[in-house]
């Protein structure tokens, strides 16, 4: 288990969490040990994401850097976007989706690190995106005051909803039965079946991060030191606790045997791990904390779990016309992309093309056969 945090100071921090056995009369001990610091970006880090092998970081320098956590090396960099990278989401271990201030959303093949599809998603910035647990749909919000639904099977826009203000967070629930949209200090809860707001949660200050603890329980952090836990059905605040000495910037939750864990990162330079009780009305207990000495901006938790081959995005449409060629180096040097000529071969997100190859099209063969029969009839008449 590795806690990974990005900072305004352009540095990436990694801490390995060591779990000690519980002693008589004492709880199990969790100890974060500094593992690495890495300075590869030329501007502050804005977003992090992880799967079972990689951690990826997005920055205001418009690049995405890839880190192989099993080999502990920098794997490469992607330079497709022309604006601050604002959102990164893995779906399983085969695909990554990125969004940026250039208004584009890109789908990447993680095995080859190739851009399979580019959407012109918003007229303004893409501020956040979230993938449905099924992998068939994605939601995005941007600075054009729209909430957009994407059909990832066909690789196209499915629905556009106008909202009154610019939303900066959108997130699916773990089951995919509901989703939330955050505007300033308010969380609108939507039901998937009706696509309408079923209720609104109001926080004290502007919301900076949210994470679902269960299908109906949501942790909310704002521009303050407090984290609040809400019930999305009753809209009731179940509990709140002071997590940091400065505003909380990002949160991640996950489950391991015997523990449901919430991790928080703050401008005060601390990463903290909290264990959540079954009764969410009881505030969580602090497991451990790590001090970085930097102003933290984003957070992810890398869990060394076996790859799940079933988790992958369904097929999408054709690859982006400016298909990038990625040069990979394992030495830890920065790897840039070189744009190659457009690839004429059709592909899909799963990597298996179902399009007929040139010269073997059934339509072309049928036309050729009809032309041959017409030629024979013409010769008989002559």
UniProtKB/Swiss-Prot annotation:
It comes from Mus musculus (Mouse). GO terms for cellular component: nucleolus. Pfam families: Beta-prop_DCAF4 (PF23761), WD40 (PF00400). Interacts with PAK1. GO terms for biological process: cell population proliferation; negative regulation of signal transduction; regulation of signal transduction by p53 class mediator; ribosomal large subunit biogenesis; roof of mouth development. Residues 365-382 have a biased composition (Basic residues). SUPFAM superfamilies: WD40 repeat-like. Negatively regulates the PAK1 kinase. PAK1 is a member of the PAK kinase family, which has been shown to play a positive role in the regulation of signaling pathways involving MAPK8 and RELA. PAK1 exists as an inactive homodimer, which is activated by binding of small GTPases such as CDC42 to an N-terminal regulatory domain. PAK1IP1 also binds to the N-terminus of PAK1, and inhibits the specific activation of PAK1 by CDC42. May be involved in ribosomal large subunit assembly. Residues 313-382 are annotated as: Disordered. This is p21-activated protein kinase-interacting protein 1. InterPro entries: G-protein_beta_WD-40_rep, PAK1-Kinase_Regulator, WD40/YVTN_repeat-like_dom_sf, WD40_repeat_CS, WD40_repeat_dom_sf, WD40_rpt. The keyword Repeat applies. Keywords: Nucleus, Repeat, Ribosome biogenesis, Signal transduction inhibitor, WD repeat. Gene3D superfamilies: YVTN repeat-like/Quinoprotein amine dehydrogenase.
């Amino acid at each position: 288990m590795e806690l990974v945090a990005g900072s305004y100071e352009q540095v990436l921090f990694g801490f390995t969490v060591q779990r000690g056995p519980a002693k008589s009369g004492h709880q199990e001990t969790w100890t974060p040990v500094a593992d690495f610091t890495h300075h590869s970006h030329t501007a502050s880090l804005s977003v992090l994401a992880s799967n079972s092998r990689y951690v990826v970081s997005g920055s205001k320098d418009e690049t995405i850097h890839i880190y192989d956590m099993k080999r502990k090396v920098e794997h490469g960099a992607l330079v497709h976007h022309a604006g601050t990278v604002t959102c990164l989401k893995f779906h399983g271990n085969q695909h990554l989706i990125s969004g940026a201030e250039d208004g584009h959303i890109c789908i990447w093949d993680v095995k080859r690190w190739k851009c399979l599809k580019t959407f012109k998603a918003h007229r303004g910035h893409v501020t956040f995106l979230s993938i449905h647990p099924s992998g068939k749909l994605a939601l995005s919000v941007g600075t054009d005051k729209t909430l957009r639904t994407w059909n990832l099977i066909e690789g196209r826009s499915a629905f556009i909803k106008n909202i009154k203000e610019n939303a900066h967070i959108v997130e699916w629930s773990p089951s995919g039965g509901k989703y939330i949209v955050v505007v300033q200090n308010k969380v609108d809860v939507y039901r998937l079946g009706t696509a309408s707001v079923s209720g609104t949660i109001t926080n004290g200050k502007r919301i900076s991060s949210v994470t679902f603890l269960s299908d109906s329980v949501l942790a909310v952090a704002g521009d303050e030191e407090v984290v609040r836990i809400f019930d999305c059905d009753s809209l009731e605040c179940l509990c709140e606790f002071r997590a940091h000495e400065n505003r909380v910037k990002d949160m991640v939750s996950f489950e391991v045997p015997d523990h449901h864990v919430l991790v928080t990162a703050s401008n005060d330079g601390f990463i903290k791990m909290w264990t959540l009780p079954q009764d969410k009305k009881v505030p969580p207990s602090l497991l451990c904390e790590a001090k970085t000495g930097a102003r933290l901006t984003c957070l992810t938790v890398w869990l060394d779990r076996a790859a799940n081959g079933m988790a992958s995005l369904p097929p999408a449409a054709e690859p982006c016309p400016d298909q990038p060629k990625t040069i990979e180096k394992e030495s830890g040097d920065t790897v840039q992309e070189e744009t190659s000529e457009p690839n004429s071969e059709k592909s899909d997100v799963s990597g298996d093309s179902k399009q007929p190859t040139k010269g073997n099209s059934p339509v072309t063969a049928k036309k050729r056969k009809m032309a041959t029969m017409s030629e024979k009839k013409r010769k008989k008449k002559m």
